[in-house]
UniProtKB/Swiss-Prot annotation:
Weakly associates with the stable SPT16-POB3 heterodimer to form the FACT complex. This is Non-histone chromosomal protein 6. Residues 1-32, 68-116 are annotated as: Disordered. One of its GO terms (cellular component) is chromosome. CDD domains: HMG-box_NHP6-like (cd01390). It comes from Cryptococcus neoformans var. neoformans serotype D (strain JEC21 / ATCC MYA-565). Residues 28-96 bind DNA.
Length: 116
């Protein structure tokens, strides 16, 4: 007798993909964390020191190294993260301001069309 599954299995279909909203290519990139700046610097070193390490192993080794670092060693990465956060906030504010301006212009166009 075949086993009957009681769980509803949802598989993504082509119609599901069509329902997703498109991402705006002009949207600013998110700010990187101090850890991500550290990873950018250290990933190649870890890979050369451990050539047999898998992607997951490299990630684990990076995490271990990050946790072993003291505050002074982390400061350059935290400074980069702070600067990147300021950049992201500034770009996001500009992006939102552009969006509001274009929405107001579109609304004004609609209202002028309605008057005619």
């Amino acid at each position: 007798m075949p086993k009957v599954s009681t769980k509803d299995s949802k598989k993504s279909t082509a119609s599901d993909a069509k329902k997703r909203t498109k991402k705006d290519p002009n949207k600013p990139k998110r700010a990187l964390s101090a850890y991500m700046f550290f990873v950018q610097d250290y990933r190649e070193r870890i890979k050369t020191e451990n050539p047999e390490a898998t992607f997951g192993d490299v990630g684990k080794l990076l995490g271990i190294k990050w946790r072993e670092m003291n505050e002074n060693e982390k400061k350059p990465y935290e400074a980069k993260a702070k600067a990147d956060k300021e950049r992201a906030d500034r770009e996001n504010a500009d992006y939102k301001a552009e969006g509001k301006a274009s929405k107001k212009a579109a609304k004004a166009d609609e209202e002028s069309d309605d008057d005619e």
